[in-house]
Amino acid sequence: MRMARVQLVIAITGATGTVGKALLSTLIEAGEPVRALVRDPRRLGPYRVRVQLAFSDLGDPHALRHALRGADTVIHLAATIRDQPPRRVEEVNGLGTLRLLRAAERTGVERFVFFSAIGATRFQRTRFFRSKALAEEGVRSSPLRTTIFAPSIVYDRDDPWVTIMRRLALLPVLPISGSGKALYQPIWARDVARCVLASLEGEGDSRYELAGPEVLSYEQMGRLIAAASGRNRPIVHVPLPLVRSGLIWLRRVFGETVFATWEEAELLEIPMLTSRGTADANALGVDPRPMGEVL
């Protein structure tokens, strides 16, 4: 059953990320009024003149309450894989979500849309997945109408990870960290955005696992990106201990501007699969495209 939704403001965190950029474009095209919660509006690019702006920080409850006034829906995309000194992953992903949730409850927001991840549990070995699981538990316990999306790996043609892989393909060989055998069901950011838009017409209190139509390993995704760039390269697997040592050293040298961290590399050893395949996306009227076709 679908219900008509009075058109009020949709507040978005993480609007400058891979999903956020695709979602901004999709919502604007659909004529939805959008408010982006940002620290630096310049990172929105041309979208900054097409949306409302609210300066806020997940560490500031007062600023969050001010930013959410007049909004009926919050879409919470902001998250981090690496520490953001002085804040750690757990504070940004876990406590930050709870602060935003409480602000939404106090300012009259009706619906809270949260992005978790396939495979997020308290018992995962990575801090990112554990923090996402704890945040999801908090969202589930809220009195608001909630919608939870748990996607597999989300990509876009020019997202940071695809860009790094494309640059690595300039080398004579394509380096892949670890075994490269972890499996994913990659889904295009634009398809994810279409799922979110469709879900806004529902009653809420739903959870969707979003996946693309293919099961691909990390190595296979790397090959697809290289091939789409016109560069078919032989694969070289870099042992994880060497990857870890190298990335830790780079972070010490370059600080938080380093292009990748061990936490990010470690995630590419953890499968993100759902037995539901594309069923949840299909239920929202979206037929996800294969990765090779998008690239």
Describe every region a protein language model picked out.
Residues 116, 137-160, 167-170:
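Conserved beta-loop-beta element that borders a ligand/cofactor-binding pocket
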Residues 42-99, 103-106, 118-122:
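NAD(P)H-binding glycine-rich loop region in Rossmannoid oxidoreductase-like domains
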Residues 2-4, 199-262, 271-295:
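Mid/C-terminal beta-alpha module of Rossmann-like enzyme folds, strongest
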Residues 13, 37, 74-78, 112-118, ...:
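SDR active-site strand-loop-helix element
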Residues 4-32:
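N-terminal Rossmann NAD(P)H-binding glycine-rich loop of SDR-like oxidoreductase domains
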Residues 99, 160-161, 178-200, 206-209:
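Substrate-positioning beta->alpha
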Residues 90-94, 113, 132:
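Short alpha-helix in the Rossmann-fold core of NAD(P)-dependent oxidoreductases
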